[in-house]
Amino acid sequence: MKALIILGSNNPEGRTATGAKALAKGFEKGGGTTETIMLSKLNIERCRQCELAGWGICQSEGRCIIVDDFAGIFEKIKKADAVVFATPVYFADLSDMMRTFTDRLRRVTFRKAEKVGTQGVPAIGMCMSGGSGFGAPSCCYNLERVLLTCGFDIVDMIPFRRQNFDTKLKVFEITGEWLATKPTSGNPPGMQIPIR
C-alpha cells in the first residue's frame, strides 16, 4: 500500500509539512510506504483554459497540453493507493500552489475519473491555518469540492490550526495508520457535490 502526499507549502519544516510527516509516520506504522511531493520544488504552470470554451485536450483526452511537472505527479496519483492533500490556509482557501495544481487536476479528471484512474482512490485533505484558525474549515470545504470533482473517495478532511496543532499531530498519526487499511467513505463511486 502506497500513499502519495502532496504538500502545498513552501516550508519543509512548517506546521503543514510537520502534520503531513505525522500522517506519513502513521501510514508507515500501518505497513504502507509514502512519497511526499513538495509542490514548491516543482514547475507547475497555471491552467491556460485552452480554446474558446476553456477546454482543450484535458476534456477530450484526460491529459494536459502544458509540458511541466504536472504530468509526472498525475501519473503518481494514478498509481497510488491513497492520496493526501496537505495545504496551508490562505484567506480561508488553499495555498496558491495547491490551487494551481488542483485546478489542473480537476480539468484532466472531470467526468473522466474512472478512465484516468482517480475514481474511488481514497483521499484525505489536511488544511492548516496559522492565524486565527477560522479559515481551516472553509479551506477543507473548498478542497473537498475539488477532490470530489476529481473522483476521489474522500475518507477524511482535517482542519487544524496553530492553537490545536500538538493535539492534531497525534490525530494525524492515528489517521495515517487507519488510512493504511484502505478505508472507504461508503459513498457511491463518482459521487459529486453539486457545483453551483
Which ranges hold each PLM region?
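Short, glycine-/small-residue-rich phosphate/pyrophosphate-handling segment
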Residues: 95-97, 110-156
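N-terminal beta1-alpha1-beta2 submodule of the flavodoxin-like/Rossmannoid cofactor-binding fold
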Residues: 1-111, 158-160, 164-196
